[in-house]
């Protein structure tokens, strides 16, 4: 069987490399060639690590020649949002200011763990400055364009990560999610994006935005790739005090268990309003495929979103306060304005937001006593045009940048695990549906996604 390296998923590539059907060097060389030819059209990469990638690929081939198993992701090319430390590169976090920092001396924990699983790093990816945004329109490094329509945004803040997978440049990337920065671009680019439980994966060596909310997670074009990557990334890490010490729970062995024992519901109320019809139709399509007839009401999600904004803006502004005072001109104007607004939030608002967060977490946990999975839209509509400032949602004109996260913020606010799954629509742009579970139940989410994938309801073909 001849492997189409552009279309094959990570699991298939790794299996072919381990079986000796193709070399890791050939796979990585092909990825580097695709990046060289096609990246200019989408502006996904801010750095390409060609030399080290080819060296690492050769080491994988040598290990296989000696009868060793290099890991579940042997020879698979991957790339990461440029807020992850990569040894030898400066960690930009999408900013001009960070470009003055010295190169990182070691890889972020997540990068190191994927390398330990045999994956080969090929570069760093574009993002909104300091991860504050949903569009990846960056005044320093340019806009990342959506492979489905290059006149439109890829989403953000992990836009380079989602577009690189959707365009077939690499099968696997890492991003981060504070308020929706994995799920929004996954939806707009038509791929899978997992935001695990808060604290499940180590963030050590990643440039954080708002520590109360920051998560890391993978993008891929198949459910098994998400599961394999998630499993490779799990594990305690003393370098990140938020990272859990609870044992890893492998999701890949559970992937084909089916969903007969799962109680699944659709989120109504807030999550069934304030969206374009096609976003709600995507949820209905998934619900129908899963024979879901139950609905649940998540209480006060609009307040959760407001509280998430207060905490995010306050923590982000505090982190960057010195530079906001001394060199405001060096920030992306859109980011600077939001951070400056954050400096003016009263401390008692922040305290009230954190108190509400506890109340909200308890109420949502009560819902999960009666259901295992909740379905909701990922974004309120399809990808907006580059430079578009306003969009119409449910007949109302609203700002693009904050409102792309309308349905994601109330969920990351309490650290729930969520997978955005892609609904492809012939002749139209893709949309995502969120599959949501209680903390540490990623394996249940992935089982649901696997059923939908097997039915052909969700899929992530590369954009030709």
Residue ranges, per PLM feature:
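Conserved hydrophobic/aromatic pocket- or pore-lining residues that grip, position, or stack substrates
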Residues: 31, 53, 75, 81, ...
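Short helix-loop capping/hinge segments that flank enzyme active sites or metal/cofactor-binding pockets
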Residues: 73-96, 258-267, 310-365, 377, ...
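Short glycine/serine-rich loop/turn segments
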Residues: 73-216, 269, 376-397
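Structural helix-boundary/capping segments
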Residues: 37, 116, 167-270, 284, ...
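Flexible, acidic loop-helix segments that line cofactor/substrate-binding pockets
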Residues: 43, 240-248, 262-263, 268-270, ...
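An N-terminal boundary/leader segment
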Residues: 1-54, 461-464
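Acyltransferase
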Residues: 24-29, 58-61, 276-297, 321-326, ...
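Short, well-ordered beta-strand elements within core beta-sheets of diverse protein domains
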Residues: 13-19, 79, 98-102, 214-221, ...
